[in-house]
Amino acid sequence: MPAAGSEPSRPPSPPGVQEQSAEPRPPPPPHGELQYLGQIEHILRCGFRRDDRTGTGTLSVFGMQARYNLRDEFPLLTTKRVFWKGVLEELLWFIKGSTNAKELSSKGVKIWDANGSRDFLDGLGFSDRAEGDLGPVYGFQWRHFGAEYKDMDSEYSGQGVDQLQKVIDTIKTNPNDRRIILCAWNPKDLPLMALPPCHALCQFYVVNGELSCQLYQRSGDMGLGVPFNIASYALLTYMIAHITDLKPGDFVHTLGDAHIYLNHIEPLKTQALMELRGQSSRSLDGDGQAGTSRWAPVATDTERDRCCELQREPRPFPKLKILRKVETIDDFQAEDFQIEGYNPNPTIKMEMAV
């Protein structure tokens, strides 16, 4: 018997068996892509039917936000293959200040071809503009905000405000500034643009040696555009962090009109969720106003919770490596970037609404 007041000795734990911790290890954070898939599901369930500029028709909600971690991963979506070369080449084209769609097309990236076509430009009243000349779109606003736009071949060096360089300089000299903003929305130039900016404004934020970015996107095509935009602004954050000796932090994506084109509904069901089993896939209830209608699945909330399951599980996000030390934003080349571990689900074909 042990002496009064003494504690009986316990035999040592067998090898390999550890004492149970008083504080269990927290579960890993959910996959970042689930935010995007949740947005798709929410629009399919709750979106309003709205007409749009292209005549295609959309399901739309107003106001959404997601936050993507950039520290050890790169948010290139995995539930479908995202056109990484297109993301990279388009961003380099923006940084160059180019407004020539043919320049991008010559690199095999044809995402601006339709908006720069002869028919499209003529339809906007730009019949005197050369084919491929998009007007003062993103790159021009980033590098020459306020300059007078003539055409895609004119020289604009030293004209207007180089917002992108000003962002970089401010991050280096005054990282606590709350005005580190890059804006593509220029009301004076909107009538000259083949397409007004969808991703209109981004703000950068520095804390604890990390650079984060928040994008305000006035119009988000959830099927085609948004996966591209997530990767593009994540890449821009990596690039600016690299040349300012910071580490990437978060990318915060704020959407205004977040919409699914009606001809993208079935492809996105393949990507995001399964149809409600035994139910009509959709029903418009007619309660909308001014030509709008609410998207209303027939199933109850309980049935939706049971029946809506992920059709494609997200896979681990890849990593992005910058292969050499680059000193200025204009020195980046496509060969400087390497995506590692990208193993997405197959491509899902969707037609672009023009």
Curated annotation (Swiss-Prot):
Compartments (UniProt record): Nucleus; Cytoplasm; Mitochondrion; Mitochondrion matrix
Binding site for (6R)-5,10-methylene-5,6,7,8-tetrahydrofolate: D221, A353
Reaction(s) the record says it catalyses: dUMP + (6R)-5,10-methylene-5,6,7,8-tetrahydrofolate = 7,8-dihydrofolate + dTMP
Official protein name in the record: Thymidylate synthase
Principal location listed in the UniProt entry: nucleus
Domain of life the protein comes from: Eukaryota
Glycyl lysine isopeptide (Lys-Gly) (interchain with G-Cter in SUMO2), cross-linked positions: K349
SUPFAM superfamilies documented for this protein: Thymidylate synthase/dCMP hydroxymethylase
Source organism (scientific name): Bos taurus
GO cellular component, one term: cytoplasm
CDD domains: TS_Pyrimidine_HMase
Family: Belongs to the thymidylate synthase family.
Active site feature: C198 (nucleophile)
NCBIfam families for this protein: thym_sym (TIGR03284)
GO terms, molecular function: thymidylate synthase activity
Span list, region Disordered: 1-32
EC number: 2.1.1.45
Membrane-spanning residues: none
Keywords annotated in UniProt: Cytoplasm, Isopeptide bond, Membrane, Methyltransferase, Mitochondrion, Mitochondrion inner membrane, Nucleotide biosynthesis, Nucleus, Phosphoprotein, Transferase, Ubl conjugation
A Pfam family of this chain: Thymidylat_synt
Function description: Catalyzes the reductive methylation of 2'-deoxyuridine 5'-monophosphate (dUMP) to thymidine 5'-monophosphate (dTMP), using the cosubstrate, 5,10- methylenetetrahydrofolate (CH2H4folate) as a 1-carbon donor and reductant and contributes to the de novo mitochondrial thymidylate biosynthesis pathway.
Modified positions (Phosphoserine) in chain numbering: S117
GO annotation terms (biological process): dTMP biosynthetic process; dTTP biosynthetic process; methylation
Pathway membership: Pyrimidine metabolism; dTTP biosynthesis
